[in-house]
A protein has these predicted regions:
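Active-site hotspot residues in diverse enzymes, especially metal/ion-binding acidic/histidine motifs
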Residues: 1-155
């Protein structure tokens, strides 16, 4: 089962509905959770035929299902609201990266690949997801980066 199929299966298991809608082009996905309706992820129809972009956006929106507290659909009138929104977006993005690229998978692929493009292809993710995963690793898991760097030095 590929990563996108795993995301769809997770949505099914969590009773998250997925809707394809015509959004403004700058909005690619939205997670909606309200007591009166089941959790729903609305994805922009413009990414329907782009498997990697769909996987990236869907993973982040599923990340909101597991990490976001509160409703951010309201207008952000105060600076503290914007800061809180940024933190929630970071949590969802971190969840997405960890779901799509496990630490062991990243380390194993780094050992086998000779280029960034090869690494992206082997991990079956977009450059953006790989970049974010490495950025989050640099903050959270220095041991993983240390192991990757040591391996690269020994090659």
């Amino acid at each position: 089962m590929n990563k996108l199929d795993k995301l769809y299966k997770l949505c099914e298991d969590e009773n998250i509905q997925i809707e394809w809608v015509n959004f403004n082009p700058c909005i690619l996905g939205v997670y909606i959770s309200d007591k009166d309706i089941p959790p729903t992820i609305a994805l922009n129809k413009s990414i329907f035929n782009d498997r990697l972009k769909t996987m990236e956006i869907l993973a982040e929106e599923v990340g909101h299902h597991f990490t976001t507290n509160g409703n951010f659909a309201n207008r952000l009138l105060h600076y503290s609201d914007r800061v809180r929104l940024i933190k929630e977006e970071q949590k969802a993005a971190r969840w997405a990266c960890n779901f799509l690229i496990g630490d062991d998978e990243l380390f194993d692929c780094v050992k086998k690949c000779t280029s960034e493009d090869e690494l992206i292809e082997m991990l079956d993710v977009s450059f953006g997801i790989l970049y974010d995963k490495l950025r989050f690793c640099s903050v959270e898991n220095m041991e993983l980066l240390y192991n990757i760097c040591n391996y690269l030095k020994s090659v």
